[in-house]
């Protein structure tokens, strides 16, 4: 999945750097001579020194005295050997997170074990270059310095869904790309964004069209604002909220590839007319358990006679029959997709 690695990696400790003042960062990871990761360590046994002090050292003193070091910085690590966290140079302290898992490990770890998962997980060479390439989001228009580094659940989820979509794509696959269950606050919208980038940048998919469906308009506004502000990151200038079903049909039929379209599930009801039968369409549905469970037919009796209605999923699958479907949910449920 990662391709050939011709990069040169060096880990340098205690390098004196002279800027406005002389500073000596504890560790720097150089890739091809570029200082991409800076480490700051504190002692676990000295009670007065915490990793918050390491954070301040990086973001106050180093920023003031050796700002040149951070021109190429991807992210930073603060650690006392027991508490080990990664974060963007511009992020507040509470947005530094532990990397608690490596591929193949059954459970998440904490404490001293999280140093192992950080080095084996985040700093596995293939994963490190994947993170630098695909999992650091810089918004298109940002008034302040803003850079968002993925957290480990977002990384592993986006990668797993990407591989699953590959297998599920029609005609060879069954179109079921899988469901991601993420607890509230896990940064689900970023997982969607990272997944979208992987799909759009992938040589395998050759610029697919992505339809992002939510079932709440308030969330849709938040999500669409985030996506519309990520055109550079996604790699496609067409990232649009769709006003109506007819609007979506026009947009889908006017292209053979590319484009990210955000819509709400309610725009799909009452009509099962084909939107497109292309198989290079990936449908990402938020709160999947609510919107897609009911393929069932319902019958309503009215003065005009019997009227058949269907659950949202029926409309969806009839409208995009060859798409691959991926669901995101905060509530585990058996019948998603």
Name each model-derived stretch.
Residues 1-209, 218-234, 256-260, 296-299:
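ATP-dependent helicase/translocase motor core
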Residues 38, 76-78, 212, 283, ...:
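Structural beta-sheet core signal
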Residues 51, 97, 270, 276-337:
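Signature of the SF2 helicase/ATPase Hel1-core->accessory helical subdomain module
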Residues 81-82, 216, 263-267, 287, ...:
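A short beta-strand-to-loop transition that corresponds to the Sensor-1 phosphate-sensing loop
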Residues 147-151, 185-186, 213, 217, ...:
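Hydrophobic alpha-helical scaffolding
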Residues 217, 239-249, 265-270:
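Conserved helicase motor
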Residues 243-261, 274-278:
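Conserved motor-coupling elements within RecA-like helicase/translocase cores
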């Amino acid at each position: 999945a990662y391709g050939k690695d011709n990069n040169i990696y060096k880990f340098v400790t205690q390098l004196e750097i002279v800027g406005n003042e002389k500073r000596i960062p504890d560790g720097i990871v150089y890739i091809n001579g570029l200082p991409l990761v800076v480490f700051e360590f504190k002692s676990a046994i000295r009670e007065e020194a915490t990793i918050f002090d390491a954070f301040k050292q990086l973001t106050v003193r180093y920023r003031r005295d050796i700002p040149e070091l951070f021109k190429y910085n991807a992210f930073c690590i603060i650690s006392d050997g027991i508490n080990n966290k990664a974060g963007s140079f511009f992020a507040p302290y509470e947005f530094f997170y532990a990397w608690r898992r490596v591929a193949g490990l059954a459970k998440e770890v904490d404490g001293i074990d999280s140093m192992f998962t950080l080095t084996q997980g985040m700093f596995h060479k293939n994963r490190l270059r994947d993170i630098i390439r695909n999992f650091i989001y810089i918004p298109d228009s940002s008034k302040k310095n803003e850079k968002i580094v993925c957290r480990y659940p977002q990384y592993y989820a986006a990668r797993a869904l990407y591989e699953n979509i590959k297998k599920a794509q029609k005609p060879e696959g069954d179109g079921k790309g899988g469901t991601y269950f993420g607890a509230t606050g896990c940064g689900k919208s970023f997982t969607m964004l990272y997944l979208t980038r992987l799909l759009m940048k992938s040589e395998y998919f050759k610029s697919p069209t992505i339809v992002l469906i939510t079932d709440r308009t308030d969330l849709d506004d938040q999500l669409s604002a985030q996506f519309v502000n990520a055109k550079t990151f996604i790699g496609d200038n067409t990232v649009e909220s769709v006003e109506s079903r007819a609007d979506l049909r026009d947009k889908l039929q006017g292209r053979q590839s590319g484009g990210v379209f955000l819509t709400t599930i309610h725009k799909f009801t009452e009509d099962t007319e084909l939107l497109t039968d292309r198989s290079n369409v990936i449908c990402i549905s938020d709160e999947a358990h609510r919107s897609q469970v009911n393929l069932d037919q319902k019958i309503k009796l009215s003065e005009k006679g019997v009227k058949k209605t269907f659950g949202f999923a029926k409309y969806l699958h009839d409208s995009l029959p060859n798409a691959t479907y991926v669901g995101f949910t905060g509530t585990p449920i058996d019948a998603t997709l």
